[in-house]
UniProtKB/Swiss-Prot annotation:
UniProt domain UVR: residue ranges: 203-238
Localization in the cell: Cytoplasm
Gene Ontology MF: a single term: excinuclease ABC activity
Organism of provenance: Aliivibrio salmonicida (strain LFI1238) (Vibrio salmonicida (strain LFI1238))
PANTHER family, sorted: UVRABC SYSTEM PROTEIN C, UVRC/OXIDOREDUCTASE
Protein name: UvrABC system protein C
Amino acid sequence: MPPFDSKAFLLSVTHQPGVYRMYNAEAEVIYVGKAKDLKKRLSSYFRSNIPSEKTKALVTHIAQIDVTVTHTETEALILEHNYIKQYLPKYNVLLRDDKSYPYIFISNHKHPRISIHRGTKRKKGEYFGPYPDSGAVRDSLHLIQKLFPIRQCEDSVYANRHRPCLMHQIGRCLAPCVKGIISDEDYAEQTEFIRLFLQGKDRQVIQSLVEQMEGASQALNFEKAATIRDQIQSMRRVQEQQYVSDESSDDLDVLGFTIENGLACIHLLMIRHGKILGSRSFFPKIPAKTEKEEVFSSFLTQYYLNHSQGRTIPNRVITSFEFESEGLEQALTELSGRKVLFQLNPKGMKGRYLKLADTNALSALTSKANHKLTVYQRFKQLEEALSLASIQRMECFDISHTMGEKTVASCVVFNQEGPVKSEYRRYNITGITGGDDYAAMAQVLERRYSKQLDIDKIPDIVFIDGGKGQLNRAYDVIRQHWGDWPKRPLLLGIAKGVTRKHGLETLVKITGEEFSMPSDSPALHLIQHIRDESHNHAISGHRAQRAKVRKTSTLQHIEGVGPKRRQALLQYLGGLQELKKASVEEISKVPGISRSLAEKIQDALKQG
């Protein structure tokens, strides 16, 4: 490859702001950057004395540079983020975080439902959040259900009940589905209390409850007064647990940051309306020799500009690490329509939370490094046990079904950092005889390997959860496709052995040779890990498919029972479970249901 002619290239570069993309000889984007002054920034790559080892390595691979001029720095920042997201360049810091952020959702209904929501905000209603993870949302919902027991059931369940459910009996739902238990006004008031609570207006809620308690007491309704008193006490306990301080009543993100030995961790403490919603650790993928400031600023840009994941921009971002924040501050201010500030090393309560975030970042990084070392050591042990020069990628397949029903196959992927969950796949198996595991394995492998694979996606080992029969079938399929592969994977079956005990697995080669490893072998532990991941991934997929089928009411398959009669049956008897318990006489009392049809319905439900 002829060297890149930087002098000729720089003659045509402008001094305006913009974004540049660097390509290697294979026309792959290897780096994306932005600049206030494109000419000045790009010239810096071709100086004789480049201090950064990473930049030196990057420059040796440049074959072409494309430039996009923008009107403002903010436009350049957003375009840079979009290009990084699109191309995932080798020399950029990459935020490995493709999960959407969950919200608490209150539906737009006569009797609103409260639930967890992920993804696009299409439903009509109110969204509160986002929360850093689903665990934080579940904790909040559990708490809300204790304080303000509004319904969490699906609208279809709500519409088909006329008896209170178990949640009402244990005091976790006000049962708006049943007339006469709670008035529309009282239910609406509890819903409004939730809105205020989620907005951080706890004192307003407590003040309103205190007034109600005093009113009930003056009216000599002591039972109601005692119920409200208990609700107030619960609210005050929650305040003690969640309250930060008046000075932190803004929306804050507190970021702890640490980097050691090529690993970085940013720990996010999310505070909204003066309450800690939760925290989360991020481990961006960083090229070797990357400067600390580039790691941190790249993370912030990718994290806050990634609108598709449902993130919100806080009023203030607090950090202990100093970096050039002016451009990002300006971009976030323009995007959010309000002033966004980055604050360095504050005092008081904010300082205490910053110290906590830094401590958590260090702790999470240490844990990650230890885990990475353990996985690496297991890979090395496995290479030695199987006499392989290097293992970069492994895939494992498993099949799950119940008596041949809803067969699902799974494929899980491991590399030298452990499970690569973003590459896990499930395959719904169709067109085979129920229970034919050999045919199921053949189908999933055909679907997996019949397509053209990138070199780095070709596994070094393919594990099959099964014995000789499964392994031979797998070999017959895979060998049809590996003709043009630069390497051929080792195929291994994982048989459970005679006793079927964990730690006594038998490994099977395609030659028919069987061998085992000591139960305390790190190599065996790695094999067990990938096998268990594949097994669990297949089972969870199968259960979801099976539940989907069984959730479809048996009533849909009974001749003579159309949508109107189905709705009448469910409404009159209070749901499918109550209908299953009902006698023929009770079923025949439903409007439009004759005795003969009632008998047919009961028979069908017993068989279902």
